[in-house]
Design a protein with these regions (language model features):
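Secondary-structure end/capping motifs
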Residues: 112-187
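Pocket-lining segment of extracytoplasmic ligand-binding domains
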Residues: 52-53, 57-146
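Short, solvent-exposed polar/charged micro-motifs at secondary-structure junctions
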Residues: 7, 61, 102-103, 167-170
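Short, glycine-/small- and polar/acidic-enriched structural segments
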Residues: 1-47, 52-55, 61-64, 71-77, ...
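Proline/Glycine/Serine-rich low-complexity intrinsically disordered segments
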Residues: 11-18, 41-42, 48-50, 62, ...
Length: 188
């Protein structure tokens, strides 16, 4: 499934989260990466403030890391692999927090409408079929699409870790609770 990694710039020579004081992290405010930043730095003592910089576009985040313009960035696959191949270090991984923040959300009004319910059922079926295809064939099978949309090379595609994509399912209560706690403390 989807996971996020906090990757530090190899030129910054950061080895531990407590060294991130006075450093900039590219992420998206009020999002999974913002929540993860809060969680990974809980209880971590840094000499000074860690600066969360809002860079919404993950392609731009990767380019900023590769161009030494950012100390650390939150990325998911396949861009995390591209960064690791360039020697950038994984400082944190959302899988370590046992947190899954990716959801497909629908408004109650949409679910109440019969025509919309039919569309949502078709969407869910197509999504689950895509997951099955990815799980059966692997990401490398879709290398042309990865190159086109993510602008990554064959080397990165060949280095991608094996991933398991999950069907649409109800979110786990633990994940809902963590997201709600984050929203309560962050969004005013």
């Amino acid at each position: 499934g989807t996971y996020w990694q906090l990757l530090s710039n190899h030129k910054a020579r950061l080895k531990a989260l407590d060294q991130m004081g006075d450093k900039m992290i590219a992420m998206t405010r009020f999002s999974a990466t913002d929540c993860l930043s809060q969680l990974v730095f809980e209880g971590v003592k840094t000499k000074s403030q860690v600066y969360n910089v809002q860079i919404n576009d993950v392609q731009i985040r990767l380019r900023m890391l590769l161009n030494n313009e950012m100390d650390a960035v939150w990325l998911t696959e396949p861009l995390a692999t591209a960064a690791r191949l360039q020697g950038h270090r994984v400082m944190a991984d959302s899988r370590d927090k046992k947190l899954s923040l990716g959801v497909v959300a629908f408004k109650k009004k949409a679910v109440a409408d019969a025509r919309r319910r039919k569309q949502l059922a078709a969407f869910t079926k197509a999504y689950n079929m895509a997951c099955d295809s990815l799980n059966r064939n692997g990401l490398k099978h879709y290398s042309a699409l990865l190159q086109k949309y993510y602008k990554i090379d064959k080397r990165t595609i060949n280095a991608l870790p094996k991933s398991k994509f999950q069907h649409v399912a109800k979110p786990q209560q633990e994940n809902i609770d963590k997201a709600a706690a984050f929203a309560k403390t962050t969004i005013k």
